[in-house]
């Protein structure tokens, strides 16, 4: 069995049953529905027999027969890869992790989550004790009362729309727990003083940001440099401190540290220098969160740019993040723009909420404006 599936961060489910029970027909329908809903679905066929995708005599087939480990071909609309088994793990993971979700045909003996098809006599193809069974598809005959007694959902194979909704709901229920983090590790060179210590209405802005995140996230952290003295912020009891392990790389290094230490969690991050950010903004992005994408971020009007420092990053973002970091590509905005993120349009009345303060003059303007408002 291919154990690398256990490490997948993209949700998947197997469709298991004997030949002729309608697996491929159902998967074809589900694929069309996901496509119609603009969900990037992947399909994986686990075949215990040999298969052939190339044609003898073609250039690619000749080179594969000559000993090429990987053969690829592309045209303006498609590409294909045929590889020998030693290349399988990285080839499959790199290809399928880009999808929002994955439908697998096969793996009936695996421990993975699966939808099982009964045969025409209503018999299971695997043990009824299999803990991976999420639902059962039948042809009108069910020869196993324990399925009903255990509360396992039962679908006739013609109930394709109900099965689609069940599968889609299963994928969204796989969403990772959400952690929050306030980034305070910047050098603050233009400000001339640590931005994490700036106060508005007599209160630290970093502490305000922590308080905004606490009711919305399972845990909250302050992301900072190891040599940074946070003063009284270190005494906060409702958040934890995480020191950057990748120094000198800006927010990319901070996020890589967070995701490296907590790889099974999604992250809602904010900066410590956004004095007009409100609870409504954070609640909005959580409500719009799409856990099947690499993340969810705000997009400014007319698509002039994303807001990487008020965004949700899903666990699968760790792969392109570390790849970009290894190439010294240190712009979160550019990484986001290369990936299928969900974009949330910033409402006109909130456009100013994402302004950050980088200089003393900007801070004084923001401080004066905040003093005219009710402290948040």
What does each model-found stretch correspond to?
Residues 31-84:
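N-terminal phosphate/diphosphate-binding loop that engages ATP/GTP or pyrophosphate donors
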Residues 51-53, 123-125, 141-147, 211, ...:
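Short, charged/polar "capping" segments at the starts of alpha-helices
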Residues 43-45, 73-74, 134-140, 221-225, ...:
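Short internal beta-strands
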Residues 157, 161-170, 354-376:
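Short, basic/aromatic-enriched C-terminal tail that caps enzymatic domains
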Residues 2-49, 176-181:
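Walker A (P-loop) phosphate-binding motif
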Residues 101-169, 173:
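Phosphate/Mg2+-binding loops and adjacent switch elements
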Residues 34, 58, 177-329, 337-350, ...:
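Nucleotide and nucleotide-moiety/phosphate-recognizing core
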Residues 82-110:
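Phosphate-binding/switch loop-helix module in NTP-utilizing enzymes
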């Amino acid at each position: 069995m291919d154990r690398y599936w256990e490490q997948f961060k993209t949700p998947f489910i197997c469709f298991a049953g004997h030949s002729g029970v309608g697996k491929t027909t159902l998967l074809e329908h589900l694929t069309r529905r996901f496509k119609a809903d603009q969900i990037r679905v992947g399909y994986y066929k686990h075949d215990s027999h040999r298969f052939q995708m190339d044609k003898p005599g073609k250039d690619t087939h000749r080179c594969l027969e000559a000993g090429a480990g990987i053969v690829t071909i592309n045209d303006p609309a498609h590409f294909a890869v045929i590889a020998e088994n030693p290349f399988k793990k990285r080839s499959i993971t790199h290809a399928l992790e880009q999808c929002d979700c994955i439908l697998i045909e096969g793996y009936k003996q695996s421990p993975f989550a699966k939808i099982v098809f009964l045969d025409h006599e209503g018999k299971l193809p695997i043990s009824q004790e299999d803990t991976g069974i999420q639902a059962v598809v039948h042809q009108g005959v069910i020869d196993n009362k324990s399925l009903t007694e255990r509360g396992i959902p039962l679908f006739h194979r013609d109930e394709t729309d109900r099965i689609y909704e069940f599968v889609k709901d299963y994928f969204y229920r796989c969403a990772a727990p959400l952690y929050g983090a306030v980034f305070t590790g910047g050098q603050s060179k233009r400000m001339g003083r640590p931005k994490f210590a700036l106060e508005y209405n007599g209160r630290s802005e970093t502490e305000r940001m922590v308080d905004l995140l606490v009711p919305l996230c399972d845990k909250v952290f302050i992301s900072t440099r190891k040599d940074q003295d946070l003063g009284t912020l270190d005494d906060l009891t409702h958040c934890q401190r995480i020191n950057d392990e990748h120094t000198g790389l800006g927010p990319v290094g901070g996020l890589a540290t967070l995701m490296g230490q907590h790889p099974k969690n999604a992250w809602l991050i904010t900066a410590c220098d956004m004095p007009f950010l409100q609870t409504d903004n954070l609640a909005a992005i959580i409500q719009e969160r799409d856990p099947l994408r690499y993340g969810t971020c705000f997009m400014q009007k007319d698509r002039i740019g994303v807001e990487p420092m008020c965004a949700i990053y899903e666990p699968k973002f760790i792969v392109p993040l570390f790849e970009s970091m290894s190439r010294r590509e240190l712009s979160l905005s550019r990484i986001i723009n290369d990936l299928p993120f969900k974009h949330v349009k910033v409402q006109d009345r909130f456009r100013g909420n994402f302004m950050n303060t980088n200089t003393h003059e900007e801070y004084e303007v923001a401080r004066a404006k905040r003093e005219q408002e009710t402290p948040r």
